[in-house]
Swiss-Prot record:
GO molecular function (one): NAD(P)H dehydrogenase (quinone) activity
Name of the protein in question: Minor allergen Alt a 7
Encoding gene per record: ALTA7
Primary location recorded for the protein, binned into one broad class: cytoplasm
Family: Belongs to the WrbA family.
One GO cellular component term: cytoplasm
Organism: Alternaria alternata (Alternaria rot fungus)
Amino acid sequence: MAPKIAIVYYSMYGHIKKMADAELKGIQEAGGDAKLFQVAETLPQEVLDKMYAPPKDSSVPVLEDPAVLEEFDGILFGIPTRYGNFPAQFKTFWDKTGKQWQQGAFWGKYAGVFVSTGTLGGGQETTAITSMSTLVDHGFIYVPLGYKTAFSMLANLDEVHGGSPWGAGTFSAGDGSRQPSELELNIAQAQGKAFYEAVAKAHQ
């Protein structure tokens, strides 16, 4: 039976949503499929308006109950970094997972991450590394992007791009004006494909 994959993300300005769509495309390229979820917004609309945040994609369900993820075999987490860590919206979600932590409900499931940062030194690798403490506490098995399927893209020095062996990544610029490049989306697609293939192989 094919593994069940979820892609869980938070995206204020749409960068991580575009990366999530690319990850999904890669999973589908590998012959699988995935369910997209977004974590709940915690900022009031008045604040979001002042930040010029566009409306969220209403076609993607909001993940209110962490128990929903118990039915999935692998989960990709899309994280827009806040000081090299999860943003508050994601932290609020994780704070709801006490029951799953206590019961080991996520133990043995597979996880990967992809990120967005405002600047080159903004935490492309640090955000992924910081997420490990949460994933390890829950017993997730981390599946990195690595270099095997994306070496030429990750090693491309012809243009500025996000991404690392920890996972795909994009730069948004400090004001959110930069959108994911074709190269960054291709890296995300490669990650989705490789992640699904790895989970499917282990799931046999």
